[in-house]
Structure formats: C-alpha cells, structure tokens
Amino acid sequence: MPKRKSPENTEDKDGSKVTKQEPTRRSARLSAKPAPPKPEPKPRKTSAKKEPGAKISRGAKGKKEEKQEAGKEGTAPSENGETKAEEAQKTESVDNEGE
C-alpha cells in the first residue's frame, strides 16, 4: 500500500525536497488587539469578624420582644415599679367606684 504524501516529505523528480513555508507574521487583528484589562476584585464581606455592637443590639431586641409579650399578659415587672403603681391606682379606683 502506498504511503500518503505530506507537503513536508514531498520530493520532485530531481530528488530535491519541497517544503511548505509558513508565514511568520501574525495577522494584524491579533497583533493589534491589546490584552483585556483584569477586573478589580470586589471587597468581600468578612463573616469571621463580627461587630461587637451587633451582638448586643440583637440581645437587646430579643429582650424587648419578651418584655412586650409579657407586658401584654399584664404579669411582667417593669423598671422602676411603674407598672406596680399603675396597677395599684387601678385597683383603688375600682374600689372607690364600688362604694
């Protein structure tokens, strides 16, 4: 079976080797195209470092919610005894109305 002839191994009748010359120049499109600029990386949010104020505010919010829920029931003690004084006034006014 005859071998395939490649352009590199082609020989004329003379026995001289004919080689295909490849162009050494790059195309104008490729040489004129600049390298694309690298996008600046966006700063990432650090989840490892937490603000100490954030923890305090969350705890305070949770406590406030508990106080509000308990205040709705009417059994929650409030600061400085304000609720106790109001309850006492209510009971006195109810007693006075009955007399």
Curated annotation (Swiss-Prot):
GO molecular function, one term: nucleosomal DNA binding
Compositionally biased spans, kind Basic and acidic residues: 1-25, 39-53, 62-72, 81-93
Coiled coil: none
UniProt entry tagged with the keyword Lipid metabolism: no
Record-linked InterPro entries: HMGN_fam
Residue numbers bearing the Phosphothreonine modification: 10
Keyword entries, A-Z: Chromatin regulator, DNA-binding, Nucleus, Phosphoprotein
GO terms for biological process, alphabetical: chromatin organization
Highest taxon in the source lineage: Eukaryota
Disulfide partners: none
Residues modified to Phosphoserine: 6, 78, 93
A Gene Ontology term for the protein's cellular component: chromatin
Assembly, per entry: Interacts with the ligand binding domain of the thyroid receptor (TR) (in vitro). Requires the presence of thyroid hormone for its interaction. Interacts with transcriptional regulator SEHBP. Interacts with nucleosomes.
The protein's name in its UniProt record: High mobility group nucleosome-binding domain-containing protein 3
Species this chain originates from: Pongo abelii
